[in-house]
Amino acid sequence: MIRSTPALLPHRLSAAVLSALCLAAAPVAFAETAADPTTLDKVVVKGERAEGYSVRKTSAGTRFDLAPREIPQSISIISHQRIEDQNLDDIIDVLGNTTGVSSTQSDTERTEFYARGFYIDSYQFDGLPTQMVQNWSYGDSGLDLALYDRVEVVRGATGLLSGAGNPSASVNLIRKHADSAELAGSVSVNVGSWGRTRTTVDVGSALNASGTVRGRVIGSYLDTDAQMDRYNQHKTLGYMVIDADLTPDTQLSVSYDYQQKRANGATWGGFPMLFSDGTSTGYDESFNASPNWTYWDTTSKRAFATLEHGFANGWKFKIGATHDETKADDKLFYPAYNDWVTGASYFDKNTGAGISPSAGFYNTERKVDAIDGFVDGPFQLFGREHQFMAGLSYNKRDYANYGDYQVGGAGLAWDPFSSYLNWNGNISEPNWNPLSLASEGTITQKAGYAATRLSLADPLKLIIGARYTDWKSEGEGADRSHKVTTPYAGLVFDINDTYSTYASYTEIFQPQMLKDRNGSYLDPVDGKSYEVGVKGAWFDNRLNASVAVFRIEQDNVGQSTGEPVIGGTGGETAYIAARGTVSRGFEFELNGELAPGWNATFGASRYVAKDINDADINTNLPQTTLKLFTSYTPQSLQDLTVGGGANWQNRIYYAVPAYGRIEQDGYTLVSAFVRYRISPEFSVQANLNNLLDKKYYSQINGYGAFGDGRNGSLTFTWSF
């Protein structure tokens, strides 16, 4: 058992937040002596418009192109430059370094992300909404970042643009474009711990003499083992995009990407954490709970197109469409060892008996078709200029899951072992049956949305809007439909040219499969987010800071009555709608260029989430996190960049009624990097992660998984 952390954490957190607030004010003094910020040098990476660690404008949250300080919600930008500095490979890496986001690793191929106490299931690709689910893993959390320029995260309820989801956050992945009219590109080779080798090629050029049609191709291949024995992963990525200026005011972009991951020795869940006497099983970081024949392979193919036209009066029309096909093929092993209700372990530390071998062979497939079009622009009313936007959205997701699940043991057809002690993964594979249909269905969302940004006075802006969603689910014997209106309201007051304060109210809904006593499905869970905060911006929005206080409420959450559904199937329990989880907390973030050549991001978050019985929820996730990363390029030695960071989280625990609870102390992960440009064409970069080699769990829920120990990599890049 891991002992809890000392009670000094609130004091440490307060000191850290005060220090961060002081840091946020520092640029005011800096601005008095610094050169005109518009003269600061910029780095251009392969034709892309670099913004350091921040962006000057974004359409995140509202579709309006606004500076971060003009948006009445908490947002985080993970830029291309930061992705490069930290050597972030995939969505797991990005969200693990994002303010206010925490995660739990279900197994080697599934990682679930949470914000403000709620599961994140709302994702967007260039603004087109979709939902990702983890019960049948399609590899979404492992999406490769090589084809994305940046990631934008809006925290809280985001129903205006997302449709159905949880009041946690929305993650928007922005693709790279063909924005170079000349031949330009790079080749990079990354080698590192556990036999890691990753090669990436990125080439772009004009496709006609005038440069109005441009193309870009990105390819990447990763081959790596892991700190866990008998695990290997291969990832292949191909991406191509064509951008065309059809007229000076009309742009067309068409892209296609292919991603394939092959994971051998994949786990399903984690390893057993407790023996039957309640003592720790004591496995180390290299332990793999799976046999040698397990694997988890995923393949995704995604076509995407956008058309945008700007009118002379300042209005804009944009439409985007995507078709996505994803398949997964996996053979997995699950070492069942405990009672699901009490957590009591059957695993005998002396004999190794008590592990019930379970195995699954699954083929799953998902198809997504989505289209979203909107207009936005200015209009005059009462002598003032305002903004308006309206759009239509359609999203259809078809899925089918096929599988064969087998339980082994003494006296059964598959009896691979009698003792789990001295486990080496060398056991027999079940004789699989033909795969049968486990589940299939179609989820469709049709929506219309609109919002206006009213200039009530020079310093005061009001954003109000709503989304009407027609949601329908067919299949799995549970056809359902809901028609939901989701409001949005935000008020922003400019204190001066640097600071603004805001208040917002946003909603989102989540359908549920529970029935009342008459057999009718309950209305969707309603997530309501209240938020107030202060934001600041310096150096033409190259540095942004925000502090927010929030409250999130869930209504219409199903609560069991203990009574049967009238006319229902045997054992079907009736539910009533009740108040659900309430989450309260605050967040702080400072992100961008503190001084010429010095970029940094610092985020602090704290929340407390309780259910209707006033009990903490998701106690295996940290309620308090601090995340820092910085990079510095000396003005006198601009070929050298150095940096590093630290992520800290507080104590977590998981209740095991039979023994008490499993606890993990708070811990800090430290990272560092250095990059040197040998010549205008060649550079080398070294990254070190978990510098102090901290041993920690990335999952504790009766089953365990370890986070990565100390590891490093070298990246050699040739640019042309």
Residue ranges and their predicted role:
Residues 1-86, 92-100:
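N-terminal Sec signal peptide and the immediately downstream disordered periplasmic leader
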Residues 103, 112, 128-155, 174-175:
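Short acidic/polar hinge/loop motifs at secondary-structure boundaries
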Residues 131-132, 147-149, 160-238, 246-250, ...:
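Outer-membrane beta-barrel translocator/receptor signature
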Residues 222-226, 239-245, 249-310, 325-366, ...:
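Acidic/polar loop-and-plug regions of large Gram-negative outer-membrane beta-barrel proteins
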Residues 245, 366, 385-397, 437-554, ...:
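Structural signature of Gram-negative outer-membrane beta-barrels, strongest in the C-terminal barrel
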Residues 308-312, 316-322, 326-332, 526-593, ...:
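Membrane-embedded beta-barrel scaffold of Gram-negative outer-membrane proteins
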Residues 457-459, 576-657, 692-695, 715-717:
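Gram-negative outer-membrane beta-barrel transporters
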Residues 647-655, 672-720:
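C-terminal beta-signal and adjacent terminal beta-strands/loops
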